[in-house]
Amino acid sequence: MEYKVEDVSPVKKKVNVTVPVEEVDAALGAAIAMYRTSVNLDGFRKGKVPASIVENRFRKEIYAEATQDLVNVHINEIVTSLAVSPLSRIDFDGGELERGKEFSYTISFEVMPQFDLPDYEGFAVEQEKAVVDEKEVDEVIARIRRNMAELVPVAETRPGADGDVVVLDFAAFENGEPIEGVSAENFQLSLGEKQSLEDFENLVKTIPAGQEAEGPITFPDDFLNPDFAGKTVTMKVKVHAVKERRLPEIDDALAQKAGGFESMEKMRETVVTSYMQSREQLHKATAQKSMLDKLLKMVDFALPESMVDMYVGNLIEDMRVKMERQGRGLESLGKTPEQLREQVLPEAQQIARSQIFLLAAGRKEAVEVSEQEVDGQLQQLAMRSGQDFDTLKDYYVRNGLIFNLRDRLIADKAMDAIYAKANVTMVDPAPAA
């Protein structure tokens, strides 16, 4: 086999392959031999069918498999020899093997761009210190205290006010007819917490326990359910009870009941530790992004189209999932697929640039990712999505997604590796506005 490489672009290669007659005939012979071992034909013992009969009987299957097997062998040899890793699907352009004839075909694929990494050792970067003040801890304790409050019916007969919890029935009507899906019984509404529409809360705040009333409610133009957006309906409400919160004392008993802490002091320490850990991670991630953005401005390279397309698809899919959670579809954005692509393209290109840079840094830093680490990431994905781990892993393997997942883990490790070599200065948080 001989081949000639053509660089179509800095990130795309085309390989013209020529296969001599001897190799063609050997590939066909090997495929026929494989068929002979398993084929069953009347009048012949298994494995004893003459090669010529097997070839004539199963010519289409044999020649197709022989071609595919030979091309796959060549692809492995070529990419190994060139020391490249194809990013995209390898496109094949050629016919099928013919006995006694030379075989020619071409393959094309995208590869990572080649560029020189800037010197990142000692790179100056600032990271904000993680700070937690007592007021924030007090606010957390106050929320815990409030959530554990006892709800007690108010002594007097009065409408609910901010801070109260009202137990009520409600139903929406349009032109005197009930609106399906907009009703509830014994619904608990915390007033003053923006849990419902302002018009609805204002109506509820006029109704004492044991009474009912109705009034117009206008849904906002951006309401999640487009069927009600901007619409005015009649809401009928019956209040069963108005309750106030009886707050527990802030003491060791509250800490024990809230989370099994031995004291309120231990509970406060845990809150501080949790805040510190999350903020340290956040500030580190912010500093890493700042460092990466600056390093990316120091290099220039072409972006593989297939890689950008993959991230465009991912971003649009993320958008679709987010919209569905809000009860809406992508079509509610009023944009064509082309307009959506144009909208997310800059972000997709930036993600691709970052990934390419970090994978190059990962090679320089000899970053490795084990199969156990990949499985661990898949386990987390399976738990978050409620899917079976083996089913999810099989899907990732069959669709080639496992390589993208591994690359993402390599990129994350590479970012940590180059950040560890940076000159990081810890700075005080900016004063609150």
From Swiss-Prot:
One Gene Ontology CC term in the entry: cytoplasm
Keywords from the named record: Cell cycle, Cell division, Chaperone, Cytoplasm, Isomerase, Rotamase
Catalytic activity: [protein]-peptidylproline (omega=180) = [protein]-peptidylproline (omega=0)
GO molecular function, one term: peptidyl-prolyl cis-trans isomerase activity
Pfam families from the UniProt entry: Trigger_C, Trigger_N
EC code(s) of this entry: 5.2.1.8
InterPro entries: PPIase_dom_sf, Trig_fac, Trigger_fac_C, Trigger_fac_C_sf, Trigger_fac_ribosome-bd_bac, Trigger_fac_ribosome-bd_sf, Trigger_fact/SurA_dom_sf
Compartments in which it is found: Cytoplasm
Keyword Transcription regulation: no
Described function: Involved in protein export. Acts as a chaperone by maintaining the newly synthesized protein in an open conformation. Functions as a peptidyl-prolyl cis-trans isomerase.
PANTHER family: TRIGGER FACTOR CHAPERONE AND PEPTIDYL-PROLYL CIS/TRANS ISOMERASE, TRIGGER FACTOR-LIKE PROTEIN TIG, CHLOROPLASTIC
Domain observations: Consists of 3 domains; the N-terminus binds the ribosome, the middle domain has PPIase activity, while the C-terminus has intrinsic chaperone activity on its own.
Protein name: Trigger factor
Higher taxonomy: Bacteria, Pseudomonadati, Thermodesulfobacteriota, Desulfovibrionia, Desulfovibrionales
Gene: tig
